[in-house]
Swiss-Prot record:
Name of this protein: UPF0102 protein Amet_2739
Single Gene Ontology MF annotation: nucleic acid binding
SUPFAM superfamilies per UniProt: Restriction endonuclease-like (SSF52980)
Cystine crosslinks: none
Origin superkingdom: Bacteria
Coiled-coil portions: none
Similarity annotation: Belongs to the UPF0102 family.
Length: 114
C-alpha cells in the first residue's frame, strides 16, 4: 500500500468520525513505541483507531492485517498516550476502520475490535 493511499483512508475515516459526532484529538500519533492513526473522542469515550485501506479485497479483508502483535503495539502506544495526557474519567476502546477504494468507496468500521 502506498503512503498516499493510507493517508487518503485516514482522511476518509477522520471525516466519517466527525460526521458521527466525534472530535479528532490526534492523527498519526507517533512515539518510539509505534503509531496510532487516529485518536478521537465523543462524550466520555476515547477511541484509538487503526485505519486499513486497500484498493480491493483480493488479499483478504484489511482488518486481517491487525494481528496480535499489532494489537499489542497499539495497546502500548495508547497506554503511553493516556499516561502522558493524564487522562482519567474516560472509557477507552480500540477500533479498526477498513476502507476499500475501488469502483466505489466502502467503509467498514468496527467498534471495540480488540
Amino acid at each position: 500500500m502506498s503512503k498516499s493511499l493510507g493517508e487518503l483512508g485516514e482522511r476518509i475515516i477522520g471525516q466519517y468520525l466527525e460526521k458521527k459526532g466525534y472530535r479528532l484529538i490526534e492523527t498519526n500519533y507517533r512515539t518510539k513505541l509505534g503509531e496510532i492513526d487516529i485518536i478521537a473522542y465523543k462524550g466520555t469515550i476515547i477511541a484509538f483507531v487503526e485505519v486499513k485501506t486497500r484498493r480491493s479485497q483480493s488479499y483478504g479483508m484489511p482488518c486481517e492485517a491487525v494481528n496480535w502483535q499489532k494489537q499489542q503495539r497499539l495497546h502500548r502506544v495508547a497506554s503511553h498516550y493516556i499516561a502522558r495526557k493524564g487522562l482519567i474519567n474516560y472509557d477507552f476502546r480500540f477500533d479498526v476502520a477498513e476502507v476499500i477504494i475501488g469502483k466505489e468507496k466502502k467503509i467498514h468500521y468496527i467498534n471495540n475490535a480488540f
